[in-house]
Amino acid sequence: GENWKDVPDNKLFVIDLTTNPPAQIATVEVGKQPSGLSINKAGNLALVANRADNSISVLSISGKDVKLIDTVPMGEQVAHVVFTPDGKRALVAKFPGHKIGVLDVDGQKVTDTKHNMNVGLWPYNVDVTPNGALALTADNGNSGASDGNVDTVSVIDLEATPPRVIDRVVVGDAPEGLTISPKGNLAAVV
């Protein structure tokens, strides 16, 4: 109804997957409207994209202990974040800016490089091939709503210095989900 008001939360729930059934063991306060989450391969660092706070939360992971250790301001709304396989960089989907940003990761220190790549309209998701050579973005096209038009997946060359967009592939309307297979030879976009 007309009295409904959208109020973004700031909670991240920590789930213990070793119990049967899995159980919530902690709640960590991050930025407003946590949207995308990525954990590095070492399992000791997580990044959270906070849409309503225009920031990335940096969390340390030690066993079952998860702590907020830093917040990186991004200057605009971010929808998703993903580590590169080597854990030295992360890519950030800057949803309304139609860009992918690059973060440097040095241990637990995360910094915005200020390098942005123009991709298709409204990038909502980003993933990296297992070898770290390419990244793909799901370019939603219309701020989350279907508009009946085809949209794109942008292809980013991560081996270039600096990384750059090298292609766009036309896909169906309003892609949000995107994943790359463990071998890196297939991608699924929904």
Q: Residue locations for each model-derived region?
A:
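Predominantly soluble domains enriched in secretory-pathway, periplasmic, or organellar proteins
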Residues: 1-190
